[in-house]
Amino acid sequence: MLRKAFVMSVFPDCHDDYQRRHNPIWPELAEVLKNHGAHHYSIFLDKQRNLLFGYVEVESEARWEAIAQTEVCQRWWKYMSDVMPSNPDNSPVSEALEPVFYLD
């Protein structure tokens, strides 16, 4: 299992919208994530800095990357693009984090 962590951001006045849209996420999106090998997916919000910290365990990098090509993921990105910085393809602007410590 691969562990992935990343940082995104949310617009300062959109914290509540971001949280509401994730509780719960669309059932079809949850199904795609699970079917593509995503486990233990969490997102944490730092309200003071408008930062989102994501953590997910994936079965393979290729399966994780394939999620972006699904129709439901494309719709989700568009749905979220008004509450967070997004790339031209509507994917969230994100930065992968480098692992520095792990305790099993």
From Swiss-Prot:
GO terms for cellular component: cytoplasm. Its EC number is 5.1.3.32. It catalyses: alpha-L-rhamnose = beta-L-rhamnose. Pfam families: rhaM. Pathway: Carbohydrate metabolism; L-rhamnose metabolism. Its main location: cytoplasm. It is an enzyme of class 5 (isomerase). SUPFAM superfamilies: Dimeric alpha+beta barrel. The keyword Cytoplasm applies. Substrate binds at Y18, Y41, W76, W77. One of its GO terms (molecular function) is L-rhamnose mutarotase activity. Gene3D superfamilies: 3.30.70.100. Keywords: Carbohydrate metabolism, Cytoplasm, Isomerase, Rhamnose metabolism. One of its GO terms (biological process) is rhamnose catabolic process. It is found in: Cytoplasm. The active site is at H22 (proton donor). The keyword Cytoplasm applies. Homodimer. Involved in the anomeric conversion of L-rhamnose. Belongs to the rhamnose mutarotase family. PANTHER family: L-RHAMNOSE MUTAROTASE (PTHR34389:SF2). This is L-rhamnose mutarotase. The lineage of its organism: Bacteria, Pseudomonadati, Pseudomonadota, Gammaproteobacteria, Enterobacterales.
